[in-house]
Amino acid sequence: QGGWPRNPIPP
């Protein structure tokens, strides 16, 4: 769970 550029991990 993520969201570029806040979280560099894949959704």
Curated annotation (Swiss-Prot):
Expression (tissue specificity): Expressed by the venom gland.
Q: Listed GO cellular component terms?
A: extracellular region
| Location(s), subcellular | Secreted
Modified-residue entries (Pyrrolidone carboxylic acid), positions: Q1
| KW NADP (keyword) present | no
Entry's Gene Ontology BP terms: regulation of blood pressure
Recorded GO molecular functions are: peptidase inhibitor activity; toxin activity
For this UniProt record, the keywords arranged alphabetically read as follows: Hypotensive agent, Metalloenzyme inhibitor, Metalloprotease inhibitor, Protease inhibitor, Pyrrolidone carboxylic acid, Secreted, Toxin
Q: What does this protein do?
A: This peptide both inhibits the activity of the angiotensin-converting enzyme (ACE) and enhances the action of bradykinin by inhibiting the peptidases that inactivate it. It acts as an indirect hypotensive agent.
Q: What does the similarity note say?
A: Belongs to the bradykinin-potentiating peptide family.
What name does this protein carry? Bradykinin-potentiating peptide 11b
Record organism: Crotalus adamanteus (Eastern diamondback rattlesnake)
